[in-house]
Structure formats: C-alpha cells, structure tokens
Amino acid sequence: GLVPPHMAGRDAARIAILLPFSSENAGARAESLRLLRAAELALFERAGSNLLLIPKDTQGTADGARAAAMAAFEDGADMIIGPLFGQVARRANIPVIAFSTDTSTAGNGVYLLSFPPELEVARVVEYASRQGVQRYAYLGPQSRYGMAVNTALRDNAGLTGAQLTAEAFYTGDVEAMASASSRLARGVFEPITPEEALVLRQSEWVPHPDAPFQAVMLPEGSTRLRTLGPLLISQAVDPLVVRFLGTGLWNDEDLLREPALHGGWFAGPDRASHERFEQSYEAAYGSRASNIASLGYDALALAAHLEGGELGFSREAIENSEGFLGIDGLFRFSSSGVIERGLAIYEVQSRGFREIEPAPLTFDPLAY
C-alpha cells in the first residue's frame, strides 16, 4: 500500500478502517464520515508518528465489506476497525475492532466496540433492584432490539432475586403502542389524586409494595418514546408510582421536554468525558459529533495504545482484564470478544440528565 512521504522508510503500524462511505443510505454515509473524522482526531491527539490510518469503503454491502477486508489484508493491516454493520472475514493474528451490537459476530479475534443493550439493561436493573424493585415489566417493540432487551431484563431481574411479572409487545404505530400499554396495565392501576401526587413529588421514590410491577422498561427513543410515556400515564401507570427505565436510546436531550419521562432512569457512559470529546470534535471540524462518533476515536486510541505496548496487537493485550479508559469511560473485552463497560446511572429531569450513581473507575477481577 501507499505510504505518505513523511513515513517513508518507517515500519509503520497499519490500521485499516472499514466504513460504508458510498452506501446508498445517506445516514450511513454521514455516520461513516463522522467515525472517520473522530478516528483522525484520535490519530492527531493520541497516536505517535508511527501509525498509518487506511480508510476502506465497504459500500454498505456484505460483498463490499469482504472486498474491503481483503484489500486491507493485502495492504498489510495490523488491525482492522469496523465495519459499521455486519462482519468481515477473519484472518489469523489480525484483530478486528467492530462497531456492531450483535454479539453473535464476536469472537475469534473480533471485538465489539459498541453499546450492546444487554449491558445497559444489566446496569440499570442492578441499580433499581438495590433501590428495592422486586417486580419489573416490559413494554416495547417486538423487534430484534426489543427482544434482546426483554431477555436481558428477565435474566438480570432473576439475578437480583426479582421477577419480570408483565410484558407487552407491539409492532407498528401509535395505535399498536396504545393497545400494548392497555394490555400491560390491565386496568389494575388506580389514578392517583392531585393530593397524592403532591406528597409523592415531595418525597423520595420507593417501590410501591402492592403494585403489580414497580418499574417498567421502555426500550424506545426519540418521538416513539415521547409517545409511549404519556400512553402509560393514560392507563394510570404513573411515573410517580412506577419507575420508568430505559436503554441508551434515552441518551437524547430532546426527551427532557416530555414530563412523563421525568424521574426515569437509564445507564450510560460518563457524560463529562463525552462532552469534552464533542467540544474537540466541533473545534476541529466545525460540525457536531454523533452519539457513536466517539467509537471511532476510542478504536484508534486503542490501536495507538496497543502499538506502543510490548504485546502489540495480540489478543493478550486487547483482552487486558484491567481494561482501557476511553471517551465513553472504562471498557474491556472478554475472550469471547464481547465488551464490558463501566456505566453511570442517570435520572431524567426537566433541566438535564442528573448522574445519580457514577460509573466505576476500575473493574472487578474477571472470574474464571
């Protein structure tokens, strides 16, 4: 492959980044550019002069991803970052840092630098259970994402000695969401009086001992979430009584305008660190970073860290049990390629997301 003149004659570490730069989907093209720019920012801020970043276009197709990976191998890539969707061919001793949330694509040298919803659910359920929640409910889409959240909710509730006692799925529009909200509530919740509401607002929330469920998981974001909250209230499922829980889809400041979501909890990365990254990105490029652009930065920063270490790009180095500190906080990879993240707990309030429990600064030792 070509080497810039200033790197001629050096034994440079080659990092290929595979993204759908020419995808038919305009959103994917825009996200690819943001991820590449974030990686270039990390190259400037974190890497030495011995790292070469090589962009490859996957075109947003499986065939394109395979061709891009083969081209990266032929260019002598020491590590591959990407793709954004799906998976690429694996080659011995060349690690892949992919952005997929589909854990079935991980392993055998493929590591997922992403935000799997299972992690977010595990963290918020662990926190809610410590606050006394014993009975959980699920209200969400019957999609691959929704089913992953539902399974994680059931599993993690069980780990804390709690139960998933009610669930309702929907596919489609507001009418389907309203019908599911009604099925979930089953008419067993009594509307609270204005006097009761005043008392509840002035006191610390505790799980209601007689409620059929004390917390409900709503794995939606944006407009659909702003619709779902009021639909539950219309069924007398009041957030003053039942705690609303979310996933990383809640990490969107547009949601602050919806009073039905105030008081809700979700798990997410350290916001202070992410905001510093957003400021650096905007200063460098004059445009805003997306929520996942930081993954491009952390992937390249990880490559720079590995390149400077004694173990290089080996699995042993990538699977360091102490983990790495990135833009989105602490993370580490298991031997199966799945990511573990240190996440904070946030409460939705009218003026912003309030951190109610910080992200951990260190990981517990891995159990073997």
Give each language-model segment a name:
Residues 1-368:
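Extracytosolic ligand-binding ectodomains
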